[in-house]
C-alpha cells in the first residue's frame, strides 16, 4: 500500500436529480465519489463521473436502465486497503464483513461504530429531512486506515 498521500472520499446520497452549485464546488478535488442511491438522473451520474471515479448504488427511485451494469443495489469494493459496502437501505449492508458501510434513504446524517465497522449515512445533498440542511460526508483514508470523517453542510 504505502500511498504517497491520503485519499479523499466524498460521500453523497439522495440528490434526486439536483446537484447544487455548493455540492459541485465541494466535490472538486475528490479522489473518489460514493453515491448511496436516489441519483434519479443519468446526466447527474455522468457529470459526477467527470469530477472523479464514482461508486454508486441504486435507490428506491432509480432504475437499471439509467446507469448501466456497473450500478446495482449493493456495491462491495476495496479502496486504499479498506473494505467498503454501499447500499441505499441500511438493512442491506453486510456490516459484519466490511470496514465501512454506507447507506442513504433517510435523508438524515448518521455515524455509528458497529464492532469494527464504521456505518455512515451522509444525509441528503439536495432534499434533507430533520433540522439539518443539505449535507455530504468526507472521509480521508490512507494505508488501510480512516484518518478522518466529517459531515459538510452545503448551505
Please give the residue ranges for each predicted region:
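N-terminal active-site segment of His-dependent metallophosphoesterases
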Residues: 1-54, 62-73, 132-135
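Active-site metal-binding loops of divalent metal-dependent hydrolases
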Residues: 13-17, 37-39, 60-62, 89-91, ...
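Juxtamembrane helix-loop transition sites at the ends of transmembrane segments
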Residues: 35, 59, 142-144
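Conserved beta-sheet core of the metallophosphoesterase superfamily
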Residues: 55, 78-149
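Acidic, histidine-bearing metal-coordination/catalytic regions of metal-dependent phosphoesterases
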Residues: 1-8, 13, 138-155
Amino acid at each position: 500500500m504505502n500511498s504517497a498521500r491520503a485519499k479523499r472520499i466524498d460521500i453523497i446520497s439522495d440528490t434526486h436529480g439536483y446537484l447544487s452549485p455548493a455540492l459541485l464546488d465541494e466535490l472538486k478535488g475528490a479522489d473518489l465519489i460514493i453515491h448511496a442511491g436516489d441519483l434519479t438522473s443519468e446526466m447527474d451520474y455522468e457529470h459526477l463521473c467527470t469530477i472523479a471515479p464514482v461508486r454508486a448504488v441504486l435507490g428506491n427511485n432509480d432504475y437499471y436502465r439509467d446507469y448501466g451494469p456497473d450500478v446495482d443495489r449493493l456495491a462491495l469494493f476495496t479502496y486504499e486497503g479498506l473494505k467498503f459496502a454501499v447500499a441505499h437501505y441500511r438493512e442491506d449492508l453486510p456490516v459484519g464483513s466490511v470496514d465501512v458501510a454506507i447507506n442513504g434513504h433517510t435523508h438524515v446524517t448518521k455515524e455509528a461504530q458497529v464492532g469494527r465497522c464504521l456505518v455512515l449515512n451522509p444525509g441528503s445533498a439536495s432534499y434533507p429531512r430533520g433540522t439539518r440542511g443539505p449535507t455530504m460526508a468526507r472521509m480521508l483514508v490512507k494505508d488501510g486506515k480512516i484518518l478522518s470523517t466529517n459531515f459538510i453542510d452545503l448551505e
